[in-house]
C-alpha cells in the first residue's frame, strides 16, 4: 500500500442519531485498530456496536483486499454523516398528530497502515 492509498468501509442507514455516534467516534479517532476494538467493546453506549462492526469490516477489507497486517492499522479518518430521517406520527387529542423523526446515520471509517 502506497502512502496515498487508504482502506475504507461504510455502514449506511444505521438507526441511531449521528450526534450519539460522534460522541463515541471522538474517543477512537487516531487510535490503532486493536486499541479501538478494545475501547468499543467496553464502552457503555449503544453506538459502540455498529461502530465496532464497521471498524471490524474495514480491517477485513484491508487484510483480504490489500494483504495488510491488522496489527499495523491505524484509524486515520472516522466520521458519521446524517442519513434520512424516518417519519412517524403520534396521535394527539382532538384529531391532531405530532411528528416523530427517527434519525439515521452513515458511519465511515478509513484506516492506513503504519510501517
From Swiss-Prot:
Its main location: plastid. It is found in: Plastid, Chloroplast. Keywords: Chloroplast, Plastid, Ribonucleoprotein, Ribosomal protein, RNA-binding, rRNA-binding. The keyword RNA-binding applies. GO terms for cellular component: chloroplast; large ribosomal subunit. InterPro entries: Ribosomal_uL22, Ribosomal_uL22_bac/chlpt-type, Ribosomal_uL22_bac/org-type, Ribosomal_uL22_CS, Ribosomal_uL22_sf. It comes from the Eukaryota. GO terms for molecular function: rRNA binding; structural constituent of ribosome. Gene3D superfamilies: Ribosomal protein L22/L17. One of its GO terms (biological process) is translation. The keyword Ribonucleoprotein applies. NCBIfam families: rplV_bact. Belongs to the universal ribosomal protein uL22 family. This protein binds specifically to 23S rRNA. The globular domain of the protein is located near the polypeptide exit tunnel on the outside of the subunit, while an extended beta-hairpin is found that lines the wall of the exit tunnel in the center of the 70S ribosome. HAMAP family: Ribosomal_uL22_B. This is Large ribosomal subunit protein uL22c. It comes from Thalassiosira pseudonana (Marine diatom). The gene is rpl22.
